[in-house]
Amino acid sequence: MQQSTIGAVYSNFLGQAPDWYKKSIIAFLIFNPILFMADPYIAGWALVLEFIFTLAMALKCYPLQPGGLLLIEALFIGMTSPEHMKHEIVVNIEVVLLLVFMVAGIYFMKDMLLFMFTKLLLKLKNKIALSMSFVAASAFLSAFLDALTVVAVIIAVGMGFYSIYHKVASGKEFHSDHDHTSDDHVDHPKRQDLEDFRAFLRNLMMHAAVGTALGGVMTMVGEPQNLIIADKASWNFGEFFVRMSPVTIPVFFAGIATTFALEKFKIFSYGAQLPQVVRDILTAHSHQQEATRTKQDSAKLWIQGFIGIWLVIGLAGHFAAVGLIGLSIIVLATSMNGIIDEHSIGKAFEEALPFTALLCVFFGVVAVIIDQGLFTPVIDWVLTFEGRSQLVMFYLANGALSMVSDNVFVGSVYITEVAAALEHGHITRDEFDMLAVAINTGTNLPSVATPNGQAAFLFLLTSAIAPLLRLSYGTMVYMALPYTIVLTIVGLAATYFGLGDLTNWLYDMHLIEHHSATLGAEAAAH
C-alpha cells in the first residue's frame, strides 16, 4: 500500500527513533504553548524537564534534534529571546571554543596518548590500582587543564582500545579497515569477552569522569564556573586552591577511597576485569606497533609528546583561552606530522561539533531558566539563612540545581546574587569569600549525579564511545550514585564543620589575606 505524504513525513521525523519517542516530542510541542499561556513558570519547568528527558534518551536519538525543536518553539512563543540565547553563548564562548578546537587538537595527539595509556594498562594488572590511577591522573590533569579536555583524552584512549580489540574479534588484521560500530562479524564465543571488555571500559570511563570533578573543583581553571567565581572574588590561581582546600582535599581522598571500595567489593557495576584474551590482543598490538615503528613514526610520537607538554604549560599558565591553545595544538600537530589535506583535518572535528551545537541549545534553555525566573524562589529562600547554616544551604541548593541545570549557569547565578548582597551591605567580605567556596564546591561535587550537571559528563554521554560501551544516561546515573553520595556528604561535612575554622587558621598563618570590602568595578557591574 502506498504511503501517504503525511505518513512519509512522520516516518522521516526523527528517523529511526522509537514511535513512542516521536509521539512524546510531538506531544511536548503541542502542549508547551498551551501551558505557557496558562502559567509561564510551570511551562519553563516543563521545558527543562523535557530537555532532560531528551538527554536521558540520548542512545535512542541524539538530543540536538528533539531538544533543538523544543527550544525553537520556546523562542517563537516568547519563553526567551534569540538575543538572550546569543548572550548566553557569548558569555560561555570559552567553552564553545574549547569544544571546537581543543577536542580536535586531542584527536591529533591520540597516537601518543594511546601509546602511553597502553603501557599503563598492560603494566598495571591490578584493576584496583589501575582504577585509582585513572581517578588520580584525571583529577590531577583536571586541576590544570579543563575537565572537558581530560574527558576528550580519555574518550580518545578508550576508542583506541575498543577498536583494536573489536577489529581482531571480528576476524580482521590490526592494519585492516573496520567498522567497530557493528558486532555482526564478532563470533558468538567472543561475544562474552566483548561484553566483559565493554564493562571494563565503562568502569574506567566513569572513574576518570569522576576524577575530573575531584580535580576540577580544586583550581580556578578546572571548570568554567570556577573562572567566573575567581574573577568575582579577585582570587588568583594559588589563593583559589588554598581557599578551596578545607573542602576539596578531604573530598579528594574520600573519592579515592570510594574508588577502592567499589572495585574491591564489585558493587554498582564496578569490578569488571580485563579479559585475558583482550589483554593478549592489546599486548600483541603493542609489540607489533613497536616492531614496525619507523624513525618517522617515533618522531611523530616525540612531537606529540612535546605538544602535550606545551598543552599543560599553556593551560596552567593561562597564556590564552583554552580553545585558542587547542587551535595552536591543531596547527602544531598537523604541520609537524604532515597532515595537510582538508579531509584528514575535518575528521578531527566530527566528534565535537554535534556536541557544540547541543551545548548552544542548552544555553538557550539556560536563557529560558533566567527569563522565567525558575531558580529565583530557591535563591531567595537560601539568602534568608545566616552563618554556618547559610553555607550549608548554599552548598545543597547549588548541588541540587546543578543536577538539573548546568553547573556553569548555577555557579554564575549564585555568585552574582552573593556579589549583589555584598554590594548592598547585606553580608561582609569575609562572608562573601566563604559563600564563594560553598558555591564552587556545591556546583562541582553533587553535580556528578547526572550527566546534565557536568559538561564533561554530558560530553561523555553524547560521544561516539557511549553507544559502543552501552553507556546510557541511566547507567551513568547508577554508576555515579556512590560517588554522588560520598562526595556530597563529605563536602557537606567539611563545609559545616571545617570551612570556618580552617579558613580562620589560613588567615592566621597568612596563607591567605582578608580582602577589601568592595569587589571592584567589574564584579559590581556584572
UniProtKB/Swiss-Prot annotation:
InterPro entries on file: Na+/H+_antiporter_NhaB
Reactions catalysed according to its record: 2 Na(+)(in) + 3 H(+)(out) = 2 Na(+)(out) + 3 H(+)(in)
Domain of life assignment: Bacteria
NCBIfam families (UniProt xref): NhaB, PRK09547.1
Gene Ontology CC entries for this record: plasma membrane
MF annotations from Gene Ontology: sodium:proton antiporter activity
Location(s), subcellular: Cell inner membrane
Organism in which the protein naturally occurs: Pseudoalteromonas atlantica (strain T6c / ATCC BAA-1087)
Pfam families from the UniProt entry: NhaB (PF06450)
Transmembrane intervals: 25-45, 52-72, 89-109, 139-159, 204-224, 240-260, 305-325, 355-375, 391-411, 448-468, 479-499
Protein name: Na(+)/H(+) antiporter NhaB
Keywords from the UniProt entry: Antiport, Cell inner membrane, Cell membrane, Ion transport, Membrane, Sodium, Sodium transport, Transmembrane, Transmembrane helix, Transport
PANTHER family the UniProt entry points to: NA(+)_H(+) ANTIPORTER NHAB, TRANSPORTER ARSB-RELATED
Keyword Ion transport listed: yes
Protein's membrane topology: Multi-pass membrane protein
Entry similarity comment: Belongs to the NhaB Na(+)/H(+) (TC 2.A.34) antiporter family.
Role this protein plays: Na(+)/H(+) antiporter that extrudes sodium in exchange for external protons.
